Amino acid sequence: MAAKGNREKIRLVSSAETGHFYTTTKNKRNMPEKMEIKKFDPVVRKHVIYKEAKIK
């Protein structure tokens, strides 16, 4: 049986408060801090900062 990986599923939530989010994975060992990345929000049709949140 294979070992479990280090990657964890996360949700990137828009800081524009539109409710839009992306899902991705990240390696907890290499990136212990919360992820912030600039991506396109199709609701406001602009690039905004997306912040990491847990998937429920």
From Swiss-Prot:
Source organism, top-level taxon: Bacteria
Residue ranges of coiled coil: none
GO molecular function, one term: structural constituent of ribosome
Keyword Ribosomal protein (UniProt): yes
InterPro entries membership: Ribosomal_bL33 (IPR001705), Ribosomal_bL33_CS (IPR018264), Ribosomal_bL33_sf (IPR038584), Ribosomal_zn-bd (IPR011332)
Keywords: Ribonucleoprotein, Ribosomal protein
PANTHER family named in the record: 54S RIBOSOMAL PROTEIN L39, MITOCHONDRIAL (PTHR15238), LARGE RIBOSOMAL SUBUNIT PROTEIN BL33M (PTHR15238:SF1)
Family: Belongs to the bacterial ribosomal protein bL33 family.
The protein, known as: Large ribosomal subunit protein bL33
Name of the coding gene: rpmG
